[in-house]
Amino acid sequence: MIEFNKDNLKIDMEIGLLPFDQGSIAAILYPECDVAEKFGVEGLKNSDIVFSVIVYADRSFLSAQYTMDQDGGEEHHGYEPTEAEKELMWQLLENCSQQKYGCTLEKFPAVFQRMSQANHEVALN
């Protein structure tokens, strides 16, 4: 089985907080490998899936899933990453937080909320 690594898994530089749980961070990741082989789904193409993770900033939780576009509908499937893949995902999230938002992943929820509030206030004026 293919294992995600720094060469075949990239992050969308837009991470955010889930509206129903402001401590949860969500991100979209882009596999750059044979996803049919990776997820064991014959005929699956990279353009057919969205791979996402939800984490808690304190590193107490990481959940991964992929959503397949099939026959006009969506199928959601949980994915249990290996320990090495989990560490890679944490690194991708940490790097994104530091590069785009100038803070550690642990501080990201508070920084993101302040930025969102400031943007909301500007939009109202």
Task: Tell where the protein language model's regions lie, with residue ranges.
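Short intrinsically disordered terminal tails
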Residues: 1-3, 114-125
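Residue-level detector of alpha-helical secondary structure
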Residues: 6, 86, 90, 94, ...
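Charged, low-complexity interaction regions
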Residues: 101-102
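Negatively charged, low-complexity tracts enriched in Asp/Glu with abundant Ser/Thr
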Residues: 1-41
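Acidic, low-complexity, intrinsically disordered interaction modules
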Residues: 20, 30-96
